[in-house]
């Protein structure tokens, strides 16, 4: 099953992968046609950027710019896990996650899901979006599809969303509190702030 999923990603196709609490559509982050297909499957509005998954902390340095010691500390402490970092992307990156390259930033994490981590270590960065229509609830069962390969590990346990930290220069701001609390993050990065409502 893993080999078929890997082959599909390398061919520029969309697959279904499990995360901690839901299934997602996934594809090679550098394949524009695959990223476009991913957004079509979800009926995403124009300009929506996919999130990125990587298989290890070390990959981040090649994708993001302006990595500070605090960002690296957060990544090492909470990855694999439920921390999403929203970072300025490396200027040399040749990808379009669905925003036409206008955002100049991307959201990334290393998931704590062993089967998916095995895939990521062989594929490099993948673009993902929830395996459902935009705005719908996350899915805990892998959607049945004859058109795409699926790494189906059965029903997943529903759970909280990841916590999202936005990075702007030296400033770290929690823009969504999810599985990780603000207090947990502040123990690692004391200067982190909580976005005002």
Q: Could you say what each language-model-derived stretch is?
A:
Residues 1-197:
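Active-site-adjacent structural elements in enzyme catalytic cores
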């Amino acid at each position: 099953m893993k080999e078929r999923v890997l082959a599909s990603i390398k061919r520029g196709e969309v697959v279904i992968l499990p995360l901690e609490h839901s299934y997602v559509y996934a594809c090679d982050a550098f394949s524009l046609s695959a990223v476009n297909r991913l957004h079509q499957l979800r009926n995403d509005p124009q300009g929506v950027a996919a999130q990125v998954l990587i298989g290890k902390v070390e990959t981040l340095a090649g994708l993001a710019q302006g990595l500070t010691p605090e960002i690296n500390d957060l990544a090492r402490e909470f990855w694999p896990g439920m921390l999403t970092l929203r970072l300025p992307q490396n200027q040399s990156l040749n990808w379009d996650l669905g925003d036409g390259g206008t955002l100049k930033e991307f959201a990334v994490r290393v998931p704590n899901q062993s089967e998916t981590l095995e895939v990521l270590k062989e594929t490099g960065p993948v673009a993902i979006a929830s395996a459902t229509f935009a705005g719908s609830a996350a899915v805990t069962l892998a959607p049945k599809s004859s058109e795409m390969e699926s790494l189906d590990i059965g029903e997943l346990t529903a759970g909280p969303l990841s916590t999202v930290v936005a990075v702007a220069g030296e400033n770290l701001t929690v823009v969504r509190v999810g599985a990780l609390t603000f207090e947990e993050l502040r123990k690692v990065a004391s200067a982190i702030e909580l976005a005002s409502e």
